[in-house]
């Protein structure tokens, strides 16, 4: 049975209570209060829903992750990086990045990054929890992504691209930055060909929970300069 959350309690059900079909649906309801969002990521779940639906909380099994040391950069992408076609920045324009990620796409109906979702993550950004990566070309924002940093873990949320390889360049730059700072895992949530081409792979929900337990409160070993 699906658990419905109240607005006065930030506790989530155990991850092993998530449904098998649809895969990983753990709970519904609640709100997007920053304290609840932080509690959700610490617990191992994330919000994902469409306009008109209640807030749905997910913990899929398996979970798609990328270990920084397993980052794969193809020859063509390495060439693009060497050519320095793009400028990459951190936290320069979080709002523009999340709005671009929320924009309609040809291959999808609607967006799950609703206006309340955008406002909630902007608040997390103001609190220093959520971060953005911007990719610029000739002064124009052409790619980027955003996510949350907790302990030695980074939780990726969404990315966008308006130029060939722009989001990949932003992602690779972020992964290298996190690796140098001592991060051990990047949560990619759900599988995509794009992410698998960069080295992402699936691990069990149990293994993901082990990473959470071990690293969510452990400070990075290096300097993280967002």
Swiss-Prot record:
Major enzyme class: transferase
GO cellular component, one term: cytoplasm
Pfam annotation, one family: Leu_Phe_trans
Domain of life: Bacteria
Compartment annotation: Cytoplasm
GO MF annotation list: leucyl-tRNA--protein transferase activity
Substrates-to-products reaction catalysed: N-terminal L-lysyl-[protein] + L-leucyl-tRNA(Leu) = N-terminal L-leucyl-L-lysyl-[protein] + tRNA(Leu) + H(+); N-terminal L-arginyl-[protein] + L-leucyl-tRNA(Leu) = N-terminal L-leucyl-L-arginyl-[protein] + tRNA(Leu) + H(+); L-phenylalanyl-tRNA(Phe) + an N-terminal L-alpha-aminoacyl-[protein] = an N-terminal L-phenylalanyl-L-alpha-aminoacyl-[protein] + tRNA(Phe)
Keyword Acyltransferase: yes
Keyword terms, alphabetized: Acyltransferase, Cytoplasm, Transferase
EC number: 2.3.2.6
Coiled-coil residue spans: none
UniProt cross-references to InterPro entries, sorted A to Z: Acyl_CoA_acyltransferase, Leu/Phe-tRNA_Trfase, Leu/Phe-tRNA_Trfase_C, Leu/Phe-tRNA_Trfase_N
Gene3D superfamilies: Leucyl/phenylalanyl-tRNA-protein transferase, C-terminal domain, Leucyl/phenylalanyl-tRNA-protein transferase, N-terminal domain
HAMAP family xref list: Leu_Phe_trans
Job of this protein: Functions in the N-end rule pathway of protein degradation where it conjugates Leu, Phe and, less efficiently, Met from aminoacyl-tRNAs to the N-termini of proteins containing an N-terminal arginine or lysine.
Similarity comment: Belongs to the L/F-transferase family.
Listed NCBIfam families: aat (TIGR00667)
Protein name (record): Leucyl/phenylalanyl-tRNA--protein transferase
Lineage of origin: Bacteria, Pseudomonadati, Pseudomonadota, Gammaproteobacteria, Pseudomonadales
């Amino acid at each position: 049975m699906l658990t419905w959350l109240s607005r006065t309690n930030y506790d989530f059900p155990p991850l092993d209570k998530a449904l098998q079909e649809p895969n990983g649906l753990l709970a519904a309801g609640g709100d997007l209060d920053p304290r609840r969002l932080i509690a959700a990521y610490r617990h191992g779940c994330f919000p994902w829903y469409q306009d008109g639906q209640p807030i749905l909380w997910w913990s899929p099994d398996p979970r798609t992750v990328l270990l920084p040391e397993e980052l794969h950069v193809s020859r063509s992408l390495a060439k693009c990086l060497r050519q320095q076609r793009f400028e990459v920045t951190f936290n320069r324009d979080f709002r523009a990045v999340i709005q671009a990620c929320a924009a309609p796409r040809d291959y999808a109906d609607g967006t799950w990054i609703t206006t309340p979702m955008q406002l909630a993550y902007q608040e997390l950004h103001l609190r220093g929890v959520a971060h953005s990566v911007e990719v610029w070309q000739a002064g124009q924002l052409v790619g980027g992504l955003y996510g949350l940093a907790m302990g030695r873990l980074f939780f990726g949320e969404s990315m966008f691209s308006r130029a060939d390889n722009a989001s990949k360049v932003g992602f690779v730059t972020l992964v290298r930055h996190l690796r140098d700072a001592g991060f051990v895992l990047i949560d990619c949530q759900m599988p995509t060909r794009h992410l698998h081409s960069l080295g992402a792979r699936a691990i069990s929900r149990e293994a993901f929970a082990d990473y959470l337990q071990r690293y969510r409160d452990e400070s990075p070993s290096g300097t993280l300069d967002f």
